[in-house]
Design a protein with these regions (language model features):
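An acidic/histidine-cluster motif and surrounding catalytic segment
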Residues: 1-135, 146-178
């Protein structure tokens, strides 16, 4: 997602607020952020394992700005349809983030984060990870995308990965990239 330069500057260690500043990639002390969260289980297979309080905790850990977010769990049919319609890819993917806030001066980050249960379960099994930890990782990943982070080039990917690892550590979740 493009945009959010102003918001990224708020995270920067550079006090000059230059537009080229990068977001902070370490979590030291983060102010509490306002969150309106809706969680939808169109596919309910993970609903018991992922209570809303746990989802909200992971979202808040990754949130640097006030936000209104919907997190929706879908099956592979809906996941594939959304990925095809919006990204031109004819397969289900683990997470899709639809950020609706392009204005750098927006007061609130607005986004829908779609998680495909089938893909999450397959990946967690293949990677020998807990489905809960894997899902929370991808929720954090989606929330970072909603706030303007991306992994389109190697530097941005490394920065986003480092930020994810720090956030997950604050939640007691091991580095998912090891």
């Amino acid at each position: 997602m493009a945009g959010k330069t102003q918001n990224k500057n708020k995270l920067s260690n550079d006090l000059s607020n230059k537009p080229e500043s990068k977001p902070k990639t370490e979590l030291k002390s983060k102010p509490k952020t306002k969150l309106k969260l809706t969680v939808q289980f169109a596919d309910a297979r993970l609903q018991k394992q992922l209570p809303k309080a746990l989802i909200k905790k992971s979202v808040k850990a990754a949130l640097f700005f006030p936000a209104e977010l919907t997190i929706r769990f879908v099956d592979k049919v809906e996941g594939k349809a959304l990925n095809k319609e919006f990204r031109g890819k004819n397969y289900a993917t683990n997470v899709l983030t639809f950020a609706y806030t392009e204005d750098d001066d927006a007061d609130v980050t607005l986004a829908d984060i779609i998680l495909c249960t089938d893909v999450l379960q397959k990946e967690a099994s293949e990677q020998q990870k807990s489905i809960v930890d894997h899902t929370l990782h991808l929720i954090v990943h989606g929330v970072l995308h909603a706030q303007g982070h991306d992994h389109e080039n190697d530097d941005d990917a490394a920065e986003m990965e480092q930020l994810e690892v720090s956030i997950l550590a604050s939640l007691g979740i091991a580095n998912p990239y090891r």
